[in-house]
Each structure stands twice: as structure tokens, then as C-alpha cells.
From Swiss-Prot:
It is a peripheral membrane protein. Phosphorylates phosphatidylinositol (PI) in the first committed step in the production of the second messenger inositol-1,4,5,-trisphosphate (PIP). May play an important role in the inner ear development. Residues 531-537 are annotated as: G-loop. Belongs to the PI3/PI4-kinase family. Type III PI4K subfamily. It is an enzyme of class 2 (transferase). This is Phosphatidylinositol 4-kinase beta. Residues 283-302 have a biased composition (Polar residues). Residues 55-247 form the PIK helical domain. One of its GO terms (biological process) is inner ear development. Pfam families: PI3_PI4_kinase, PI4KB-PIK1_PIK. It catalyses: a 1,2-diacyl-sn-glycero-3-phospho-(1D-myo-inositol) + ATP = a 1,2-diacyl-sn-glycero-3-phospho-(1D-myo-inositol 4-phosphate) + ADP + H(+).
Length: 806
């Protein structure tokens, strides 16, 4: 308190008083001197200040701001509650009233507190109502998307807001919500009950509608609950919901399902015994019995299936079979033994197909009819045995209700062939289409061709499938056309030479078969050629709805980090597309089955840079020249641009997510020149053996720069420009990326979340406080540092010495 001065105040002569005033001129106290005694009287201004101090403390506790306090003080004088300033009422020293006692001041303080508390509560209620009104307008506007809904569901602490968001989920498209399914289920498992109660109705509703959604929920709930302690996990909400889903209680509202009549061709004359084929146990639960088929007549076109099938059992058994194969392969010592065992296991699996099973990674409804077992390959892995399979499916309208195709048995190939042994040569298109329900007689081994031995020949002799047969057939068509044409066609010699040279440049090279790396041959073969070849050898290939899918089965690996990386890549891809930045990345689908198993969507028409260098013994630039022609051709320039756009995109991904373990076995090169990074097992806070050896922002080798045209080339400058544009676009939408990672950190024990600074470091890598000029300098520094990084070279050398990765 500042200095004071004594100032006389008008009073009775017999009762002089002294008033102490502070620097502001306000009275501090009044001292009355009498005969033989000194009486202390509290001035109203002092009481006002004391009340104000109490109010400040109360409001501070209740979270009121100083601004609202000032507003209340200035507006409440008319109520007789408090005195805003010294001029609001007469001072006690100037009044004729008696002295104010201390007890009365205490009552006034309490009254002031009560009155102001009520007014403050009313004002807070008005403010909250205004905020809720604006929030409701936001929730109901067209710009409110799933990303914003997930953000408010995670950050809001108001049960009413959480419940509203839970209901709002029903308004979004299924595919938009499905993208955030890991976040929703992780919040359901690890956050409070209000969030779980808001999410559960939507999940239950979707599970009643879709078997595929039910299984994905069950798998994710099991995987994300595994981080909990066993005693807690057993009684957790996630475990209870998973049991509810797998108990098959969440069935559709209708109890019985009507089955459409089975159309029979009148001229087939097949007896019931001919039409009854061996089916799997899993399909037995969903297939239609022969007797029920015979009951469908013209007078009774529809017959209800009395026994409601077990909805989830067939698909679960199918997935378990694939996972069990991978576990058994891991016990074998050599790659050749693993490959032989894989082929025999898949051959046995084919005896249970077709069935009401499907690949969850596909984007359309279908039934699996066959697995060409000789085309399966074991992928490169030091300790485990991931394998790649191709799956023949028949597309259908609804895999839950559409009829399962009948089985067409495979038969052994003959060493000699004749016209008599080709029964399908005379089958018309209509007859082939009708064979969906009427199976031709394949009892005679001489009358059928098996894809098994054909596939073995193709694996042993891959050169036979990449010869010039297509060129010969095209040449024959061109010759016939030219012979039939009577008018001469003049073509410049230069155009002919250019077309021939570019055609040769587009002709893909082949890889030789390597017993230590059998996947190289399979992955190098063009996808369309593979589809054509497998379809020609398949007994189901003549169906118009035949499709070929592929999937990688992994056992012993936790794919939850892969799923997280996939979500971030998809979000970045969407951001760059919306901001019109021509960066290219290829996110591939991840299916988490459990905490140590899952499926991965393969990238077709792509091989690893390690396989390229090992098979061709060429530098990356020389391989580009071999595959796409000289550096002046249109094919090479297109491939070079694709390389630059994809390299810039993945460099930003590797920087933002801190992707490690970037050896050449984890970087693919596709037929169009793009690079694709795979294996995101080490991201954010984790690194191989937790050594943190790779210190560069991303991998940018001198070979990559050579493909771009060198340090002084236009394409290298284009690469740096794309890096800058991509980083600027990404930081504009930082929240959309960060929330994906932040929500998954809840309750997680994944290595990528070790340490308390994971999210903070991720946000810092977006450099929100930098100008665009500063970002440009940062990009230049990161590019220069990555090119000169000694740790990148040492890590590549370490991988070559330990694992033979070039």
C-alpha cells in the first residue's frame, strides 16, 4: 500500500476524526477519539473493498473472468446489492446514521456473495446457451463432416454434445465412418462411459446390417483390447461388445430369409446325384439343401429357409485357416520348403470351396470359388512367413443372400492333347452363362484341363508367359487388316521407327526365377497378363462375373501401426488432392485380424528396388532407361515425372511420421515409374532395436537424384517445389492428421507411442509458426541433409551385410 496522508473531515467538534486516504483518495478507515476510549468504526468503502475481494475469490474459483466481474459491478447498483464506487451512495462519515457493526458487515458480505453468484450463474447460463446455439448451427451445417464429428466426440466433455454426435453418425455415408472405425472403437474401449454410450448405438445398428462390418468390429475390438491388463480386459466394455457381436445375436430385424428360385436349364438332364458336389463344413451352414431346392416348383416359387444360418462362422473359419497356414510355414527352415508346403495347404483348402466366404479387403460383394495354389508365393522375411495368394471370386449382388456357386471339380492334366479332349470348345456363351446353376459333367479325366499342372509349368518356366505371342497375334491382326484394305496407307518412316522404339521401350523385362526369392517372378509379371493367364486355366473363368483378387497374409506381426500409417496416408492424399498439389502416394488397405495377425492389400505391377538391383544388376537410372527407353522418349519422361511426384510425396510422409527401416526392400518401384514405400512398422517414436540410427529426415540417395536428372536438373527443382507445396498444404489441415494419431494413443501400448512427447513432436514437424519463406529454407536444408546423410549409407550397408538387401 502506498504512502498515506492525514486529512480533516467535517465532523462534530467534540468528536474529531481523522480519515486516512490512499493514493487513490479513497478512505481507508475512520478513527474516532473519545474521552478515555478509542472506538473503531468500519467505513462503507472498506466494506465494499472487502466484499469485492471475497467476490473476486469466489468468481476465480468458479471460473468467472475479470471482464464479467466488472460488467456485473457496473450494472448491479440499482439492486442495492453492492456499491460500484465511492459516488454510488453517501459515505458513512457524511451520514447521520449510527455506526455499522461488524456482524452487519458480515451479513452484507454474504448477501452480496449470494446475489452476485446468482447473477453470475444466470450470465454463464446465457453464455452457455449462446455457445450451444452456435455449436448446434455448426453441427447442422453442410461443412460438418466425419472428421469434425470425431474431433468433437473426442475433445468434448459434455455428455449432451457426445450423445448428439453419436446420433449424427447415422447421417454420414458408411464408407466415411468406416475410415474412422479404429478411432471410434478405441474411444469406446479406453474412454469414459459417456463416449462409449454415444458410440455403441451406431456400432450395433451397423452390425445388424452387415456381416463384414460385424467381423471387422470384432477383430478390432479384440486387437485394441489386448493392450489392457488381462483382469481388466476380461470385463471391459470392448470385450463385452465383441462377445455380443460374435454370439450372432445382432441379426437383422427379419427372422427368415426368402431364397429365390433356382433356374434349371431344361436340356441338361442332370440327375440330383450329378448336381450334388462335395462342399465344405463352413458352407454347409449357409448352403441350400437339395431337398429344399426340389420343393421350388411353379406352384411354390419361393420357399423360406427354416433354419437361420450362422452368419459369422464360415468367414471366421476361412480366415482362421489362412492364418493357421502362415503359422505352420514359419516353422520350416528353407524358403523352398515353405513354398512347397504352401502349395499343398492351399490345394487342400480348395476342396472346401466355393463357400459363402469373401476377402474383406475387396471393395465389392463376391464369393470365393477357388485359390490357384500354384501361383502362391512366400514373401521375403527373416523370421516369419508372410505369403501372397491370388483368389478367384465371382462377383454377386449380396454375399449374404446370393446363392453360392456350385463346385466344379478340378482334374489332372494329360501329357498329350487332342481335339477330343477339349469339350468346352463348342460351348456357346449362353451355355457358359447357364452353367452357373448347371454344372457340366467333368467325371472323365480326359475331358477337363486342370490349372494345377499348367500353373506348375508356368512357375518353372516364367519365360514362356512373356514371349512375343501377344505381339505375334497383334501382328497377325494388323496383317489381315492391311490385306483386306484396298486403299494404300502411307506412313512416314520416322513415325514407324519412333513407334517401334517406344513399343520396345514399353515391353517389360522379365525376372529370372530365384529359389531364394520366388516372389520376384510373380510380382514382376504384369497384372493384366496374370489375370488373363489364370482365367484361361480356371474352371470358373468363363463366368462373366469372374474376378481375380490378391492378398498378403501375415502372422506374427502387429498390423495396428500399419493401419495407423494407412489412415494418415489416406488423409494426406485427400488433403493434397483438395489443395491441388500433384503429389502421388499409394496407400494400401490393411485388415487387422488380431494383435499379431492380419491381411495386406498387395501393390500390383510393382517390385522392390532390392529385387530390381539384384535381378538386373543395373543402377536405378539404367533400369529406367531399359524399361522406358532413352531419356528423350515420352515414356521415359512420363516415368521420370511419376518418380519425382511419388518421391516427393513419400519424403514428406517419412518426415511427418518419422518412418524408419527404409532399406531398398521396403521401397517398391511400379511399372509406371512411381516409388511406393511399404512396411510402416517403425514410425513416430519407434525405430529398429530402438537405436534411432537413421537420423535423416527421409531417404534420398544419389541414385534417386540421378533419375531426377541431377542436382541442376529441372525435375530436381520440381521435386523441391512439390515438397514445399505439399508441406504448406499439409499444415493447413494439421488437425485432420494429428487427431488420427492422438485418438489412437489412448490406452495404447504400441511402440510408436512410447514417450510422452509423441504428439507434441508430430505437431512441431508441421512448423505452424514459420512463414513460407522459412519453410522453403527448411525444405532446402532437409533435402541437402538427406542426400549427404552418412547414416542412410551405413544402414543400407548394414542391411546388405546382414540380410543381403542391395
Amino acid at each position: 500500500m502506498g504512502d498515506t496522508m492525514v486529512e480533516p473531515v467535517p465532523a462534530k467538534l467534540s468528536d474529531p476524526t481523522l480519515v486516512l486516504r490512499g493514493n487513490g483518495g479513497s478512505p481507508l478507515c475512520v478513527i474516532t477519539e473519545g474521552v478515555g476510549e478509542a472506538q473503531m468504526v468500519i467505513d462503507p468503502d472498506v466494506a465494499e473493498k472487502a466484499c469485492q475481494d471475497v467476490l473476486d475469490k469466489v468468481k476465480l474459483i468458479r471460473g468467472s473472468s475479470a471482464e464479467s466481474l466488472d460488467k456485473i459491478d457496473g450494472s448491479d447498483t440499482g439492486d442495492g446489492g453492492s456499491l460500484a464506487n465511492g459516488d454510488a451512495g453517501p459515505r458513512h462519515s457524511e451520514s447521520c446514521g449510527p455506526p455499522v457493526s461488524a456482524s452487519r458487515i458480515t451479513e452484507e458480505e454474504e448477501s452480496l456473495i449470494d446475489i452476485n453468484s446468482v447473477k453470475s450463474a444466470r450470465r454463464r447460463q446465457k453464455n452457455n446457451s449462446a455457445k450451444q446455439s452456435w455449436l448446434l448451427r455448426l453441427f447442422e451445417c453442410k461443412l460438418f463432416d466425419v472428421s469434425m464429428a470425431i474431433s468433437y466426440l473426442y475433445n468434448s466433455k459434455e455428455p449432451g454434445v457426445q450423445a448428439y454426435i453419436g446420433n449424427r453418425l447415422f447421417c454420414f455415408r458408411y464408407e466415411d465412418v468406416d475410415f474412422y472405425l479404429p478411432q471410434l472403437l478405441n474411444m469406446y474401449i479406453h474412454m469414459d462411459e459417456d463416449v462409449g454410450d454415444a458410440i455403441k448405438p451406431y456400432v450395433v445398428h451397423r452390425c445388424r446390417q452387415s456381416i463384414n462390418f460385424s467381423l471387422q468390429c470384432a477383430w478390432l475390438l479384440g486387437a485394441y483390447s489386448s493392450d489392457m491388463h488381462i483382469s481388466t480386459q476380461r470385463h471391459s466394455r470392448g470385450t463385452k461388445l465383441r462377445k455380443l457381436i460374435l454370439s450372432d445375436e445382432l441379426k437383422p430385424a427379419h427372422k427368415k430369409r426368402e431364397i429365390p428360385p433356382l433356374s434349371l436349364a431344361p436340356d441338361t438332364g442332370l440327375s440330383p446325384s450329378k448336381r450334388t458336389h462335395q462342399r465344405s463344413k463352413s458352407d454347409a451352414t449357409v448352403s441350400i439343401s437339395l431337398s429344399s431346392n426340389l420343393k421350388r416348383t411353379s406352384s411354390n416359387p419361393k420357399v423360406e429357409n427354416d433354419d437361420e444360418p450362422v452368419r459369422l462362422a464360415p468367414e471366421r473359419e476361412f480366415i482362421k485357416s489362412l492364418m493357421a497356414i502362415g503359422k505352420r510355414l514359419a516353422t520350416l527352415p528353407t524358403k523352398e520348403q515353405k513354398t512347397q508346403r504352401l502349395i499343398s495347404e492351399l490345394s487342400l483348402l480348395n476342396h472346401k470351396l466355393p463357400a459363402r466366404v469373401w476377402l474383406p479387403t475387396a471393395g465389392f460383394d463376391h464369393h470365393v470359388v477357388r485359390v490357384p495354389h500354384t501361383q502362391a508365393v512366400v514373401l521375403n522375411s527373416k523370421d516369419k512367413a508372410p505369403y501372397l495368394i491370388y483368389v478367384e471370386v465371382l462377383e454377386c449382388e449380396n454375399f449374404e443372400t446370393s446363392l453360392v456357386p456350385v463346385r466344379i471339380p478340378e482334374n489332372r492334366i494329360r501329357s498329350t492333347r487332342s481335339v477330343e479332349n477339349l469339350p468346352e470348345c463348342g460351348i456357346t456363351h449362353e451355355q457358359r452363362a447357364s452353367s452357373f446353376t448347371t454344372v457340366p459333367n467333368y467325371d472323365n479325366d480326359d475331358e477337363a484341363w486342370s490349372v494345377d499342372d499348367i500353373g506348375e509349368l508356368q512357375v518353372e518356366l516364367p519365360e514362356l508367359h512373356t514371349n512375343s505371342c501377344d505381339n505375334i497375334s497383334q501382328f497377325s491382326v494388323d496383317s489381315i487388316t492391311s490385306q483386306e484394305s484396298k486403299d494404300p496407307v502411307f506412313i512416314a518412316a520416322g513415325d514407324i521407327r519412333r513407334r517401334l522404339s517406344e513399343q520396345l521401350a514399353h515391353t517389360p523385362t522379365t525376372f529370372r526365377r530365384d529359389p531364394e526369392d520366388p516372389s520376384a517372378v510373380a510380382l514382376k509379371e504384369p497384372w493384366q497378363e496374370k489375370v488373363r493367364r489364370i482365367r484361361e486355366g480356371s474352371p470358373y473363368g468363363h463366368f462373366p462375373n469372374w474376378r481375380l483378387l490378391s492378398v498378403i497374409v501375415k502372422c506374427g506381426d502387429d498390423l495396428r501401426q500399419e493401419l495407423l500409417a494407412y489412415q494418415v496416408l489416406k488423409q494426406l492424399q485427400s488433403i493434397w488432392e483438395s489443395e491441388r498439389v500433384p503429389l502421388w502416394i499409394r496407400p494400401y488397405k490393411i485388415l487387422v485380424i488380431s494383435a499379431d495377425s492380419g491381411m495386406i492389400e498387395p501393390v500390383v505391377n510393382a517390385v522392390s528396388i532390392h529385387q530390381v538391383k539384384k535381378q538386373s544388376q543395373l543402377s536405378l537410372l539404367d533400369y529406367f532407361l531399359q524399361e522406358h527407353g532413352s531419356c528423350t522418349t515420352e515414356a521415359f519422361l512420363t516415368a521420370q515425372r511419376n518418380f519425382v511426384q511419388s518421391c516427393a510425396g513419400y519424403c514428406l510422409v517419412c518426415y511427418l511420421l518419422q518412418v524408419k527401416d527404409r532399406h531398398n526392400g521396403n521401397i517398391l518401384l511400379d511399372a509406371e515409374g512411381h516409388i511406393i514405400h511399404i512396411d510402416f512398422g517403425f514410425i513416430l517414436s519407434s525405430s529398429p532395436r530402438n537405436l534411432g540410427f537413421e537420423t535423416s529426415a527421409f531417404k534420398l540417395t544419389s541414385e534417386f537424384v540421378d533419375v531426377m536428372g541431377g542436382l541442376n536438373g529441372d525435375m530436381f527443382n520440381y521435386y523441391k517445389m512439390l515438397m514445399l507445396q505439399g508441406l504448406i498444404a499439409a499444415r493447413k489441415h494439421m488437425d485432420r492428421v494429428v487427431q488420427i494419431v492422438e485418438i489412437m494413443q489412448q490406452g495404447s501400448q504400441l511402440p510408436c507411442f512410447h514417450g510422452s512427447s509423441t504428439i507434441r513432436n508430430l505437431k512441431e514437424r508441421f512448423h505452424m509458426n514459420m512463414t513460407e519463406e522459412q519453410l522453403q529454407v527448411l525444405v532446402e536444408q532437409m533435402v541437402d541433409g538427406s542426400m549427404r546423410s552418412i547414416t542412410t549409407k551405413l544402414y543400407d550397408g548394414f542391411q546388405y551385410l546382414t540380410n543381403g538387401i542391395m
